[in-house]
């Protein structure tokens, strides 16, 4: 995604979703926000495999906080995973993600 990020940003889409870290390559919310600017909606890329499968509430909360911080205050942002949830993700991990998001948005 990195080599194509500026091209993607130039297309003028209203929003952009991007994949979670894979094979040692991570695309941060901050990197995408810099390319797309403060007015377009970004869809976060929390790691649904490593992060949520570990089911560590504090780690999940910290990851949510970091994505929110990187997106920027008042910039449109949808907190979500960067790929589908595996079948074995604990529901408690999903709840931790939702509760963390609510604590920043409400």
Language-model features: locations:
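Active-site loop segments of alpha/beta catalytic cores
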Residues: 1-106
């Amino acid at each position: 995604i990195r080599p194509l990020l500026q091209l993607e940003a130039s297309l003028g889409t209203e929003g952009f979703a991007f994949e979670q870290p894979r094979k040692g390559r991570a695309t941060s919310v901050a990197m995408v926000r810099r390319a797309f600017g403060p007015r377009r909606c970004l869809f976060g890329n929390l790691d649904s495999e490593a992060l949520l499968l570990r089911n560590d509430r504090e780690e999940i909360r910290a990851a949510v906080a970091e994505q929110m911080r990187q997106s920027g205050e008042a910039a449109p942002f949808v907190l979500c995973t960067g790929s589908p949830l595996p079948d074995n993700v604990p529901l408690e991990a999903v709840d931790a993600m939702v509760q963390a998001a609510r604590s920043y948005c409400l």
